[in-house]
Amino acid sequence: MNDYNNVLVGFSELIKNEEYRPYDGNLRLGVDLGTANIVVSVVDSNNTPIAGASYPSTVVKDGIVVDFLGASRAVAMMKGKLEEMMGVEFYEAATAIPPGIISGNVKVISNVVESVGLDVINVIDEPTAAASVLGITDGAVVDVGGGTTGISILKNGEVVFTADEPTGGTHMTLVLAGSLGCSFEEAERIKKDPKQEMLVFPVVKPVIEKMAAIVKRFIEGYDVDVIYVVGGACSFKKFESVFEKETGVKTIKPAEPLLVTPLGIAMNCKKQ
């Protein structure tokens, strides 16, 4: 198991068990306003995960905050819960955006975080945040979220290209709902149930193939040897094999793909 996989599994356990690790020095806070989940992450000055909280959410759609009050309340609740558990107060945070988002939407995302008394000291794009966790200097990071799929291409540790496409887990759910003749909410529940994966995956596979075809187009000319896929929508067991077949490029999915970007946001909670 790669080091980052051990880190991600440990971080997941902290969230599930509502625990925190002993720490020394300064803490860094990251707030990820996702389409399906809001995740708040805490790391120490060595980027070791210390604590975290996750909350299912529908306050963001395609990288745009559609329920400001709901988002603010959720972040305030999670921040308060972590502060009470750890006996600390947080004053600064980093947050993240899909690549290519317009500046007005960036401001709204920052405003949500600042509405709970946090000073936003860094806004990073989501795939680049994920690259921080994975320790990538060369390759492509594809962040498959609920509403959008973002890609960053890195060369020698520098981001040389970013893009965002409006397709993601929500589109899988819509296809599934149409196929099963059920509501969006029911399809979302079925999609997230690991026991239903044999039923679900053949239905959503064309959506994954479309995502991979888009990524293949973006990486042409960049000599990409490996693609890392992260985000909750890539949790299917065969996701990376479909991606690899479609792109012709080795594709790796870390453990706990939903938590990669949120953890990377906390790691980048430092003044730029």
Label the predicted regions:
Residues 150-152:
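A structural feature that tracks compact, well-ordered secondary-structure segments
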Residues 1-35, 39-144, 158-272:
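Nucleotide/phosphate-binding catalytic cleft detector across ATP-hydrolyzing
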Residues 155:
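A cytosolic small-molecule/anion-sensing beta-strand core signal
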Residues 147:
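Short glycine-rich anion-binding loops that position phosphate/pyrophosphate groups of nucleotides
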